[in-house]
């Protein structure tokens, strides 16, 4: 079996595993790497099939998490952005003893809209899957543009995300489809009631993919977790608001 690409950076006395979102790779953290590296030892990963972690096909959430867990430190804060938030959450469910704290960023335990639950309409996700096979690069570009929509630095942020994608070879369509399937079908709302490590959820007020309306719903469902909404951010708050993002993580570390 192939190994996933993994880089350690920084010299902080606390390990922080960073998991990127759909279609991207670990270069997405470049803008905050220096700042976070002074507080943490960072573990930068390309998820299986993405970036430099080549040779993997489509995976289920469980398979992806098991692959990442193989190389992970014994104890770390696990932070996942968007799709990566589901991987970090799954890690907290299957290996709670290895997760010092769980952080999800612009992520949802259930990305798909359901009755009484805001999210992405299932037909929109299905449409993305269809479009992937028709016009692969255009579809990824559209998805990236959606992530920064509404922020004061939207164009610049979208360019940053696009440069991250272009920095590595594009994931296979099969891998991207598998990621969309996870976003379309996974629902961790009930399972995550049982986690008892510190749990921080960060949202962007302007996020068009993960509606801020889920924050109060999850405050009620998971009273053991805390949420923070970054006011002028969209789906990539660590790019548009790096200072607020890094401050939230430094505060979490000092509370452990």
Curated annotation (Swiss-Prot):
Residue spans crossing the bilayer: none
Keywords: Biotin biosynthesis, Cytoplasm, Hydrolase, Serine esterase
GO MF entry, a single one: pimelyl-[acyl-carrier protein] methyl ester esterase activity
UniProt cross-references to InterPro entries, sorted A to Z: AB_hydrolase_1 (IPR000073), AB_hydrolase_fold (IPR029058), BioH (IPR010076), Carboxylesterase_BioH (IPR050228)
Compartment list: Cytoplasm
Chief site of localization: cytoplasm
Any matching Pfam family: Abhydrolase_1
Superkingdom: Bacteria
Keyword Cell division among record annotations: no
Keyword Protein biosynthesis included in the entry's annotation: no
Active-site residues per Swiss-Prot or TrEMBL entry: 82 (nucleophile), 207, 235
GO biological process, one term: biotin biosynthetic process
Residues noted as binding substrate in the record, renumbered to the chain: 22, 82-83, 143-147, 235
AB hydrolase-1 domain span: 15-242
Reaction(s) catalysed (UniProt annotation): 6-carboxyhexanoyl-[ACP] methyl ester + H2O = 6-carboxyhexanoyl-[ACP] + methanol + H(+)
EC number: 3.1.1.85
Pathway(s) annotated for this protein in UniProt: Cofactor biosynthesis; biotin biosynthesis
Gene Ontology CC: cytoplasm
HAMAP family per the UniProt record, alphabetical: Carboxylester
Family listed: Belongs to the AB hydrolase superfamily. Carboxylesterase BioH family.
Quaternary organization: Monomer.
Function according to Swiss-Prot or TrEMBL: The physiological role of BioH is to remove the methyl group introduced by BioC when the pimeloyl moiety is complete. It allows to synthesize pimeloyl-ACP via the fatty acid synthetic pathway through the hydrolysis of the ester bonds of pimeloyl-ACP esters.
NCBIfam families: bioH, PRK10349.1
Name of the molecule in the record: Pimeloyl-[acyl-carrier protein] methyl ester esterase
The organism of origin for this protein: Salmonella arizonae (strain ATCC BAA-731 / CDC346-86 / RSK2980)
Phylogenetic classification of the source organism: Bacteria, Pseudomonadati, Pseudomonadota, Gammaproteobacteria, Enterobacterales
Gene that this polypeptide is encoded by: bioH
């Amino acid at each position: 079996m192939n190994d996933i690409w993994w880089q350690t950076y920084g010299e902080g006395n606390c390990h922080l595993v960073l998991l990127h979102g759909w279609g991207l790779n670990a270069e997405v953290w470049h803008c905050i790497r220096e700042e976070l590296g002074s507080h943490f030892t960072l573990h930068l990963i390309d998820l299986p099939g993405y970036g430099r972690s080549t040779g993997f096909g489509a995976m289920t959430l469980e398979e992806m998490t098991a692959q990442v867990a193989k190389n992970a430190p014994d104890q770390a804060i696990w932070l996942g952005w968007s799709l990566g938030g589901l991987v970090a959450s799954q890690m907290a469910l299957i290996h709670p003893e290895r997760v010092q704290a769980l952080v999800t960023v612009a992520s949802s335990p259930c990305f798909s809209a359901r009755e009484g639950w805001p999210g992405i309409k299932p037909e929109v996700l299905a449409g993305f899957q269809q479009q992937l096979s028709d016009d692969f690069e255009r579809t990824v570009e559209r998805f990236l543009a959606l992530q920064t929509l509404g922020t004061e630095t939207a164009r610049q942020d979208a360019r940053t995300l696009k440069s991250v994608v272009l920095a590595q070879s594009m994931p296979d369509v099969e891998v991207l489809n598998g990621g969309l399937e996870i976003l379309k079908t996974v629902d961790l709302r009930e399972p995550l009631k049982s986690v008892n490590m510190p749990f921080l959820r960060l949202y962007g007020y302007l996020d068009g993919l993960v509606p801020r309306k889920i924050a109060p719903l999850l405050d009620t469902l998971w009273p053991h977790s805390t949420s923070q909404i970054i006011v002028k951010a969209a789906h990539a708050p660590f790019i548009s608001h790096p200072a607020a993002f890094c401050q939230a993580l430094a505060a979490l570390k000092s509370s452990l």
